[in-house]
Swiss-Prot record:
Comment block on domains: The N-terminal domain does not have lytic activity and probably modulates enzymatic activity. The C-terminal domain is the catalytic active domain.
Name the UniProt record assigns to this protein: Membrane-bound lytic murein transglycosylase F
Keywords, alphabetical: Cell outer membrane, Cell wall biogenesis/degradation, Lyase, Membrane, Signal
UniProt-listed Enzyme Commission number(s): 4.2.2.n1
PROSITE patterns: PROKAR_LIPOPROTEIN
Organism: Alteromonas mediterranea (strain DSM 17117 / CIP 110805 / LMG 28347 / Deep ecotype)
Membrane-topology descriptor: Peripheral membrane protein
Length: 463
Protein backbone atom coordinates (compact mmCIF):
# COMPACT_ATOMS: atom_id res chain seq x y z
CA UNK A 1 0.00 0.00 0.00
CA UNK A 2 1.32 3.39 -0.94
CA UNK A 3 -0.80 5.37 1.52
CA UNK A 4 2.12 7.21 3.08
CA UNK A 5 3.17 8.72 -0.23
CA UNK A 6 -0.34 9.96 -0.84
CA UNK A 7 -0.81 11.24 2.70
CA UNK A 8 2.33 13.34 2.54
CA UNK A 9 0.86 15.16 -0.43
CA UNK A 10 -2.51 15.53 1.29
CA UNK A 11 -1.52 16.82 4.71
CA UNK A 12 -1.00 20.47 3.78
CA UNK A 13 -4.26 20.81 1.85
CA UNK A 14 -6.33 21.20 5.01
CA UNK A 15 -4.40 24.39 5.81
CA UNK A 16 -5.63 25.88 2.54
CA UNK A 17 -9.21 24.77 3.26
CA UNK A 18 -9.17 26.31 6.73
CA UNK A 19 -7.64 29.53 5.48
CA UNK A 20 -10.43 29.94 2.93
CA UNK A 21 -13.03 29.13 5.59
CA UNK A 22 -11.62 31.73 7.97
CA UNK A 23 -11.44 34.45 5.30
CA UNK A 24 -15.02 33.80 4.18
CA UNK A 25 -16.45 33.72 7.70
CA UNK A 26 -18.55 36.75 8.51
CA UNK A 27 -18.31 36.26 12.28
CA UNK A 28 -14.72 36.12 13.57
CA UNK A 29 -13.54 34.12 16.59
CA UNK A 30 -16.50 31.74 16.54
CA UNK A 31 -15.12 28.20 16.92
CA UNK A 32 -16.40 25.59 14.49
CA UNK A 33 -16.57 21.85 15.06
CA UNK A 34 -13.50 21.48 12.86
CA UNK A 35 -11.49 24.20 14.56
CA UNK A 36 -12.34 22.68 17.96
CA UNK A 37 -10.98 19.24 17.09
CA UNK A 38 -7.92 20.83 15.45
CA UNK A 39 -7.26 22.77 18.64
CA UNK A 40 -7.75 19.55 20.61
CA UNK A 41 -5.32 17.88 18.17
CA UNK A 42 -7.38 14.71 18.08
CA UNK A 43 -10.45 13.31 16.39
CA UNK A 44 -12.70 11.01 18.45
CA UNK A 45 -14.28 8.23 16.42
CA UNK A 46 -16.67 5.48 17.42
CA UNK A 47 -16.59 2.19 15.51
CA UNK A 48 -17.29 -1.53 15.84
CA UNK A 49 -14.96 -4.48 15.52
CA UNK A 50 -15.02 -6.41 12.27
CA UNK A 51 -12.93 -7.72 9.38
CA UNK A 52 -13.95 -4.77 7.23
CA UNK A 53 -13.99 -2.09 9.91
CA UNK A 54 -11.33 -2.37 12.61
CA UNK A 55 -9.35 -5.12 14.32
CA UNK A 56 -5.92 -5.61 15.81
CA UNK A 57 -4.01 -7.88 13.46
CA UNK A 58 -0.51 -9.32 13.58
CA UNK A 59 0.89 -6.07 12.19
CA UNK A 60 -1.20 -3.74 14.34
CA UNK A 61 -4.54 -2.02 13.70
CA UNK A 62 -6.16 -3.00 10.40
CA UNK A 63 -9.45 -2.69 8.54
CA UNK A 64 -10.88 -0.72 5.65
CA UNK A 65 -12.64 1.82 7.88
CA UNK A 66 -9.59 2.09 10.12
CA UNK A 67 -7.26 2.95 7.24
CA UNK A 68 -9.71 5.53 5.89
CA UNK A 69 -10.01 7.08 9.36
CA UNK A 70 -6.26 7.07 9.91
CA UNK A 71 -5.90 8.79 6.55
CA UNK A 72 -8.43 11.46 7.54
CA UNK A 73 -6.69 12.09 10.87
CA UNK A 74 -3.36 12.38 9.08
CA UNK A 75 -4.99 14.70 6.54
CA UNK A 76 -6.08 16.97 9.39
CA UNK A 77 -2.76 16.63 11.19
CA UNK A 78 -4.40 15.28 14.36
CA UNK A 79 -4.32 12.07 16.40
CA UNK A 80 -6.93 9.38 15.75
CA UNK A 81 -8.64 8.39 19.00
CA UNK A 82 -10.60 5.28 18.06
CA UNK A 83 -13.21 3.85 20.42
CA UNK A 84 -14.67 0.42 19.55
CA UNK A 85 -18.19 -0.04 20.97
CA UNK A 86 -20.13 -3.22 21.62
CA UNK A 87 -23.48 -1.43 21.43
CA UNK A 88 -24.66 0.64 18.49
CA UNK A 89 -27.13 2.55 20.62
CA UNK A 90 -24.56 3.50 23.26
CA UNK A 91 -22.17 4.60 20.52
CA UNK A 92 -24.81 6.68 18.73
CA UNK A 93 -25.86 8.29 22.01
CA UNK A 94 -22.24 9.28 22.60
CA UNK A 95 -22.22 10.94 19.18
CA UNK A 96 -25.44 12.82 19.96
CA UNK A 97 -24.04 14.00 23.29
CA UNK A 98 -20.91 15.40 21.66
CA UNK A 99 -18.48 12.87 23.11
CA UNK A 100 -17.57 11.63 19.63
CA UNK A 101 -16.82 13.57 16.46
CA UNK A 102 -17.63 10.79 14.00
CA UNK A 103 -19.13 7.31 13.96
CA UNK A 104 -17.67 5.05 11.26
CA UNK A 105 -18.95 1.47 11.26
CA UNK A 106 -19.08 0.49 7.60
CA UNK A 107 -22.88 0.55 7.76
CA UNK A 108 -25.34 1.89 5.22
CA UNK A 109 -27.34 5.07 5.77
CA UNK A 110 -31.04 4.40 6.39
CA UNK A 111 -33.86 6.99 6.39
CA UNK A 112 -34.35 6.53 10.14
CA UNK A 113 -30.68 7.19 10.88
CA UNK A 114 -30.60 10.15 8.49
CA UNK A 115 -33.34 11.83 10.50
CA UNK A 116 -31.19 11.47 13.59
CA UNK A 117 -27.69 12.27 12.28
CA UNK A 118 -25.86 14.25 9.62
CA UNK A 119 -23.60 12.33 7.25
CA UNK A 120 -20.43 12.85 5.31
CA UNK A 121 -20.20 11.95 1.62
CA UNK A 122 -21.12 8.45 0.44
CA UNK A 123 -17.91 6.54 -0.31
CA UNK A 124 -19.32 3.11 -1.17
CA UNK A 125 -22.68 1.57 -2.00
CA UNK A 126 -23.87 -1.83 -0.81
CA UNK A 127 -26.81 -4.19 -1.05
CA UNK A 128 -28.65 -5.52 2.00
CA UNK A 129 -29.00 -9.29 1.66
CA UNK A 130 -31.35 -11.68 3.44
CA UNK A 131 -29.04 -14.58 4.30
CA UNK A 132 -29.92 -18.21 5.02
CA UNK A 133 -28.09 -21.55 5.17
CA UNK A 134 -27.47 -23.20 1.80
CA UNK A 135 -29.45 -26.43 1.56
CA UNK A 136 -32.41 -25.08 3.49
CA UNK A 137 -35.57 -24.04 1.66
CA UNK A 138 -35.02 -20.69 0.00
CA UNK A 139 -37.71 -18.29 1.28
CA UNK A 140 -39.84 -16.88 -1.52
CA UNK A 141 -41.11 -13.82 0.28
CA UNK A 142 -40.22 -11.87 3.41
CA UNK A 143 -43.80 -12.06 4.66
CA UNK A 144 -43.76 -15.89 4.54
CA UNK A 145 -40.67 -16.57 6.66
CA UNK A 146 -41.33 -19.19 9.30
CA UNK A 147 -38.49 -18.17 11.65
CA UNK A 148 -37.35 -14.84 13.09
CA UNK A 149 -34.73 -12.66 11.43
CA UNK A 150 -31.95 -11.81 13.86
CA UNK A 151 -30.15 -8.47 13.53
CA UNK A 152 -27.75 -6.44 15.64
CA UNK A 153 -29.63 -3.90 17.74
CA UNK A 154 -29.23 -0.35 16.45
CA UNK A 155 -27.57 -1.43 13.20
CA UNK A 156 -28.57 -0.36 9.72
CA UNK A 157 -30.02 -3.82 9.19
CA UNK A 158 -32.24 -3.51 12.27
CA UNK A 159 -33.54 -0.11 11.10
CA UNK A 160 -34.12 -1.42 7.58
CA UNK A 161 -36.01 -4.50 8.77
CA UNK A 162 -38.11 -2.54 11.23
CA UNK A 163 -39.23 -0.26 8.42
CA UNK A 164 -39.91 -3.19 6.07
CA UNK A 165 -42.00 -5.07 8.63
CA UNK A 166 -43.98 -1.94 9.40
CA UNK A 167 -44.71 -1.40 5.72
CA UNK A 168 -45.66 -5.06 5.20
CA UNK A 169 -48.06 -4.95 8.14
CA UNK A 170 -49.76 -1.92 6.65
CA UNK A 171 -49.98 -3.42 3.15
CA UNK A 172 -50.94 -7.05 3.94
CA UNK A 173 -54.41 -8.14 5.00
CA UNK A 174 -52.90 -10.73 7.34
CA UNK A 175 -50.20 -10.20 9.91
CA UNK A 176 -46.59 -10.91 8.95
CA UNK A 177 -45.72 -14.47 9.99
CA UNK A 178 -42.18 -13.81 11.17
CA UNK A 179 -40.64 -11.23 13.47
CA UNK A 180 -37.48 -9.21 13.91
CA UNK A 181 -35.34 -10.02 16.93
CA UNK A 182 -32.47 -7.68 17.75
CA UNK A 183 -29.48 -8.58 19.88
CA UNK A 184 -26.45 -6.95 21.42
CA UNK A 185 -24.87 -10.28 22.34
CA UNK A 186 -23.58 -10.97 18.82
CA UNK A 187 -22.13 -8.79 16.09
CA UNK A 188 -23.01 -9.10 12.40
CA UNK A 189 -20.13 -11.48 11.67
CA UNK A 190 -21.19 -13.77 14.52
CA UNK A 191 -24.77 -13.78 13.24
CA UNK A 192 -23.54 -14.91 9.83
CA UNK A 193 -21.58 -17.69 11.53
CA UNK A 194 -24.72 -18.72 13.43
CA UNK A 195 -26.66 -18.93 10.16
CA UNK A 196 -23.89 -21.04 8.63
CA UNK A 197 -23.94 -23.37 11.65
CA UNK A 198 -27.73 -23.67 11.60
CA UNK A 199 -28.16 -22.00 14.99
CA UNK A 200 -30.43 -19.31 13.53
CA UNK A 201 -32.39 -19.34 10.27
CA UNK A 202 -31.95 -15.81 8.93
CA UNK A 203 -30.04 -12.60 9.27
CA UNK A 204 -29.46 -9.59 7.04
CA UNK A 205 -25.97 -8.43 6.06
CA UNK A 206 -24.58 -5.87 3.68
CA UNK A 207 -22.79 -7.15 0.59
CA UNK A 208 -19.34 -6.16 1.92
CA UNK A 209 -19.61 -8.11 5.16
CA UNK A 210 -21.19 -11.06 3.42
CA UNK A 211 -18.40 -11.22 0.83
CA UNK A 212 -15.79 -11.22 3.59
CA UNK A 213 -17.51 -14.03 5.50
CA UNK A 214 -18.50 -16.35 2.65
CA UNK A 215 -14.90 -17.45 2.17
CA UNK A 216 -15.00 -18.66 5.77
CA UNK A 217 -18.53 -20.03 5.67
CA UNK A 218 -19.28 -21.09 2.07
CA UNK A 219 -22.76 -22.36 2.98
CA UNK A 220 -24.06 -18.82 3.48
CA UNK A 221 -26.61 -18.18 0.74
CA UNK A 222 -28.59 -15.13 -0.35
CA UNK A 223 -32.36 -15.57 -0.27
CA UNK A 224 -33.08 -12.16 -1.76
CA UNK A 225 -31.80 -8.61 -1.87
CA UNK A 226 -33.86 -6.41 0.43
CA UNK A 227 -32.36 -3.11 -0.65
CA UNK A 228 -29.96 -2.20 -3.44
CA UNK A 229 -27.44 0.58 -3.82
CA UNK A 230 -27.54 1.88 -0.24
CA UNK A 231 -24.91 4.56 0.50
CA UNK A 232 -22.24 4.08 3.14
CA UNK A 233 -21.10 7.21 4.98
CA UNK A 234 -19.76 8.39 8.34
CA UNK A 235 -22.24 9.79 10.85
CA UNK A 236 -21.90 13.26 12.40
CA UNK A 237 -23.89 15.09 15.09
CA UNK A 238 -27.06 16.48 13.51
CA UNK A 239 -26.97 19.93 15.08
CA UNK A 240 -23.31 20.77 14.56
CA UNK A 241 -22.07 23.08 11.79
CA UNK A 242 -20.89 21.73 8.44
CA UNK A 243 -17.16 22.32 8.90
CA UNK A 244 -16.26 18.66 9.56
CA UNK A 245 -18.56 17.56 6.76
CA UNK A 246 -16.83 20.00 4.40
CA UNK A 247 -13.44 18.59 5.40
CA UNK A 248 -14.72 15.05 4.77
CA UNK A 249 -15.93 16.04 1.32
CA UNK A 250 -12.51 17.48 0.52
CA UNK A 251 -10.72 14.45 1.96
CA UNK A 252 -12.73 11.84 0.07
CA UNK A 253 -12.49 13.89 -3.11
CA UNK A 254 -8.73 14.02 -2.77
CA UNK A 255 -8.21 10.32 -2.01
CA UNK A 256 -10.44 9.38 -4.92
CA UNK A 257 -8.57 11.71 -7.26
CA UNK A 258 -5.18 10.49 -6.06
CA UNK A 259 -6.14 6.84 -6.52
CA UNK A 260 -5.48 5.87 -2.91
CA UNK A 261 -9.13 5.00 -2.23
CA UNK A 262 -9.14 2.58 -5.18
CA UNK A 263 -5.95 0.96 -3.90
CA UNK A 264 -7.44 0.59 -0.41
CA UNK A 265 -10.72 -0.80 -1.71
CA UNK A 266 -8.83 -3.36 -3.79
CA UNK A 267 -6.78 -4.39 -0.75
CA UNK A 268 -9.84 -5.35 1.28
CA UNK A 269 -12.53 -6.17 -1.28
CA UNK A 270 -10.99 -6.44 -4.75
CA UNK A 271 -10.37 -10.19 -4.59
CA UNK A 272 -13.56 -11.32 -2.82
CA UNK A 273 -16.34 -9.94 -5.03
CA UNK A 274 -16.66 -13.21 -6.94
CA UNK A 275 -17.77 -16.23 -4.93
CA UNK A 276 -17.55 -19.90 -5.87
CA UNK A 277 -19.39 -22.15 -3.42
CA UNK A 278 -17.85 -25.43 -4.60
CA UNK A 279 -14.30 -24.03 -4.67
CA UNK A 280 -14.64 -22.49 -1.21
CA UNK A 281 -15.97 -25.70 0.33
CA UNK A 282 -13.25 -27.77 -1.32
CA UNK A 283 -10.52 -25.39 -0.20
CA UNK A 284 -11.63 -25.26 3.43
CA UNK A 285 -11.85 -29.05 3.54
CA UNK A 286 -8.38 -29.45 2.03
CA UNK A 287 -6.93 -26.85 4.40
CA UNK A 288 -8.16 -28.79 7.42
CA UNK A 289 -7.03 -32.17 6.06
CA UNK A 290 -4.43 -32.31 3.27
CA UNK A 291 -2.45 -29.22 4.29
CA UNK A 292 -1.24 -30.87 7.50
CA UNK A 293 1.04 -33.13 5.42
CA UNK A 294 2.98 -30.16 4.05
CA UNK A 295 2.59 -27.38 6.62
CA UNK A 296 6.01 -27.93 8.19
CA UNK A 297 7.66 -27.80 4.76
CA UNK A 298 5.94 -24.52 3.87
CA UNK A 299 7.09 -23.10 7.20
CA UNK A 300 10.64 -24.42 6.71
CA UNK A 301 11.17 -22.92 3.25
CA UNK A 302 9.05 -19.76 3.44
CA UNK A 303 12.05 -17.64 4.42
CA UNK A 304 10.91 -14.00 4.55
CA UNK A 305 7.55 -14.98 3.06
CA UNK A 306 4.44 -15.79 5.05
CA UNK A 307 4.22 -19.59 4.89
CA UNK A 308 0.45 -19.30 4.46
CA UNK A 309 0.96 -17.28 1.28
CA UNK A 310 3.29 -19.97 -0.07
CA UNK A 311 0.70 -22.61 0.84
CA UNK A 312 -2.03 -20.61 -0.91
CA UNK A 313 0.12 -20.46 -4.05
CA UNK A 314 0.63 -24.20 -3.90
CA UNK A 315 -3.09 -24.85 -3.61
CA UNK A 316 -3.76 -22.69 -6.65
CA UNK A 317 -1.03 -24.54 -8.53
CA UNK A 318 -1.74 -28.14 -7.60
CA UNK A 319 -4.52 -28.34 -4.98
CA UNK A 320 -1.75 -29.73 -2.74
CA UNK A 321 -1.37 -32.79 -4.96
CA UNK A 322 2.33 -33.70 -5.15
CA UNK A 323 1.74 -35.80 -8.28
CA UNK A 324 -0.15 -33.08 -10.15
CA UNK A 325 0.79 -32.54 -13.80
CA UNK A 326 -0.60 -29.99 -16.25
CA UNK A 327 -1.20 -30.28 -19.99
CA UNK A 328 1.98 -28.22 -20.53
CA UNK A 329 4.13 -30.57 -18.46
CA UNK A 330 4.65 -28.58 -15.26
CA UNK A 331 4.56 -30.84 -12.21
CA UNK A 332 4.39 -31.11 -8.45
CA UNK A 333 3.08 -29.09 -5.53
CA UNK A 334 4.49 -25.84 -6.93
CA UNK A 335 4.01 -26.82 -10.60
CA UNK A 336 7.59 -26.22 -11.73
CA UNK A 337 8.74 -26.42 -15.33
CA UNK A 338 11.75 -28.57 -16.16
CA UNK A 339 13.82 -25.43 -16.75
CA UNK A 340 12.84 -23.82 -13.45
CA UNK A 341 13.44 -27.08 -11.58
CA UNK A 342 16.92 -27.28 -13.10
CA UNK A 343 17.66 -23.64 -12.19
CA UNK A 344 16.79 -24.29 -8.54
CA UNK A 345 18.34 -27.74 -8.15
CA UNK A 346 15.10 -29.70 -8.06
CA UNK A 347 15.82 -33.24 -9.24
CA UNK A 348 12.36 -34.69 -8.59
CA UNK A 349 9.48 -32.27 -9.11
CA UNK A 350 7.04 -34.70 -7.47
CA UNK A 351 9.04 -34.74 -4.24
CA UNK A 352 7.12 -32.38 -1.89
CA UNK A 353 10.17 -30.98 -0.12
CA UNK A 354 12.13 -30.35 -3.30
CA UNK A 355 9.12 -28.75 -5.00
CA UNK A 356 8.34 -26.41 -2.09
CA UNK A 357 11.99 -25.50 -1.66
CA UNK A 358 12.44 -24.77 -5.36
CA UNK A 359 9.13 -22.93 -5.72
CA UNK A 360 9.73 -20.69 -2.71
CA UNK A 361 13.24 -19.77 -3.85
CA UNK A 362 12.06 -19.10 -7.38
CA UNK A 363 9.25 -16.87 -6.11
CA UNK A 364 11.68 -15.01 -3.81
CA UNK A 365 13.89 -14.35 -6.84
CA UNK A 366 10.92 -12.89 -8.71
CA UNK A 367 10.15 -10.63 -5.77
CA UNK A 368 13.72 -9.35 -5.86
CA UNK A 369 13.31 -8.47 -9.55
CA UNK A 370 10.30 -6.23 -8.91
CA UNK A 371 11.50 -2.58 -8.78
CA UNK A 372 12.36 -1.54 -5.23
CA UNK A 373 10.15 1.55 -5.44
CA UNK A 374 7.04 -0.65 -5.60
CA UNK A 375 5.69 -1.13 -2.09
CA UNK A 376 3.82 -4.02 -0.52
CA UNK A 377 1.46 -5.68 -1.09
CA UNK A 378 1.73 -4.61 -4.75
CA UNK A 379 5.22 -6.16 -5.03
CA UNK A 380 3.92 -9.54 -3.95
CA UNK A 381 0.90 -9.52 -6.29
CA UNK A 382 3.07 -8.53 -9.26
CA UNK A 383 5.68 -11.17 -8.48
CA UNK A 384 2.87 -13.68 -8.20
CA UNK A 385 1.53 -12.71 -11.62
CA UNK A 386 5.03 -13.15 -13.07
CA UNK A 387 5.21 -16.64 -11.48
CA UNK A 388 2.23 -17.46 -13.65
CA UNK A 389 2.97 -15.71 -16.98
CA UNK A 390 6.61 -14.66 -16.71
CA UNK A 391 8.37 -11.42 -15.84
CA UNK A 392 8.47 -10.27 -19.47
CA UNK A 393 4.70 -10.36 -19.86
CA UNK A 394 4.26 -8.61 -16.51
CA UNK A 395 6.52 -5.81 -17.75
CA UNK A 396 4.44 -5.61 -20.93
CA UNK A 397 1.33 -5.11 -18.78
CA UNK A 398 3.08 -2.43 -16.74
CA UNK A 399 4.12 -0.60 -19.92
CA UNK A 400 0.54 -0.74 -21.22
CA UNK A 401 -0.62 0.62 -17.87
CA UNK A 402 1.68 3.62 -18.14
CA UNK A 403 0.76 4.23 -21.78
CA UNK A 404 -2.91 4.33 -20.81
CA UNK A 405 -2.40 6.81 -17.99
CA UNK A 406 -2.36 4.33 -15.12
CA UNK A 407 0.29 3.81 -12.46
CA UNK A 408 2.58 0.88 -13.41
CA UNK A 409 3.63 0.55 -9.77
CA UNK A 410 0.10 -0.14 -8.49
CA UNK A 411 -1.37 -3.62 -8.74
CA UNK A 412 -4.90 -2.21 -8.94
CA UNK A 413 -3.95 -0.44 -12.19
CA UNK A 414 -1.75 -3.17 -13.67
CA UNK A 415 -4.30 -5.92 -13.13
CA UNK A 416 -6.78 -4.07 -15.36
CA UNK A 417 -4.31 -4.32 -18.25
CA UNK A 418 -3.34 -7.97 -17.84
CA UNK A 419 -6.34 -9.23 -19.87
CA UNK A 420 -5.25 -6.96 -22.73
CA UNK A 421 -2.22 -9.20 -23.28
CA UNK A 422 -4.40 -11.66 -25.18
CA UNK A 423 -6.02 -8.96 -27.36
CA UNK A 424 -4.30 -8.49 -30.70
CA UNK A 425 -4.57 -4.71 -30.81
CA UNK A 426 -2.56 -4.58 -27.58
CA UNK A 427 -0.18 -7.53 -27.69
CA UNK A 428 1.02 -6.66 -31.19
CA UNK A 429 2.64 -3.55 -29.65
CA UNK A 430 4.33 -5.37 -26.75
CA UNK A 431 7.82 -6.81 -26.59
CA UNK A 432 6.84 -10.31 -25.50
CA UNK A 433 3.58 -10.62 -27.43
CA UNK A 434 0.52 -12.71 -26.64
CA UNK A 435 -0.11 -13.99 -23.11
CA UNK A 436 -3.12 -15.28 -21.18
CA UNK A 437 -3.08 -12.29 -18.88
CA UNK A 438 -6.67 -12.80 -17.78
CA UNK A 439 -5.63 -16.16 -16.33
CA UNK A 440 -2.74 -14.52 -14.49
CA UNK A 441 -5.19 -12.02 -12.99
CA UNK A 442 -7.51 -14.79 -11.83
CA UNK A 443 -4.48 -16.71 -10.54
CA UNK A 444 -3.47 -13.84 -8.24
CA UNK A 445 -7.00 -13.06 -7.06
CA UNK A 446 -7.62 -16.73 -6.22
CA UNK A 447 -4.42 -16.89 -4.18
CA UNK A 448 -5.39 -13.75 -2.30
CA UNK A 449 -8.69 -15.38 -1.33
CA UNK A 450 -7.00 -18.63 -0.33
CA UNK A 451 -4.44 -16.70 1.70
CA UNK A 452 -7.15 -14.76 3.56
CA UNK A 453 -8.88 -18.03 4.36
CA UNK A 454 -5.67 -19.65 5.61
CA UNK A 455 -4.93 -16.68 7.87
CA UNK A 456 -8.40 -16.96 9.38
CA UNK A 457 -8.23 -20.76 9.74
CA UNK A 458 -4.82 -20.41 11.38
CA UNK A 459 -6.14 -17.82 13.83
CA UNK A 460 -9.00 -20.19 14.67
CA UNK A 461 -6.53 -23.01 15.34
CA UNK A 462 -7.99 -25.13 12.53
CA UNK A 463 -4.76 -25.70 10.61
Amino acid sequence: MQSQDYKKRLKLQIIIILSIAVMSCGVPNVPTALSSLLERESIRVGTVYGAGTFYNGAEGPQGFEYELLAGFADYLGVTLDLYPFYSYEVMLEQLEEGNLDIVATGDAVTPALKRRFAYGPAYQRVEQELVFQAGATRPRDLAELDSPIIAVAGSSQAHLLSNLFKRLSEEEDEAVQTQLITTEDSDSEELLQQVANGDIAYTVADSNRLALQRRRYPNLAVARTLNENMPMAWALPLQQDDSVKAALIEYFGTVHQSGWFTVLEDKYFGHIRQFDYVDSRAFNYAAESTLTQYKSLFQKYAGDLDWRLLAAMSYQESHWNSDAISRTGVRGLMMLTLATASDWNVDDRTDPEQSIRGGSRYFASLLNRIPARISEPDRTWMAMASYNIGMGHLEDARILTEQQGGNPDLWVDVKRRLPQLRQKKYYRTTRYGYARGDEALQYVENIRRYYDSLVWLDEQGKI
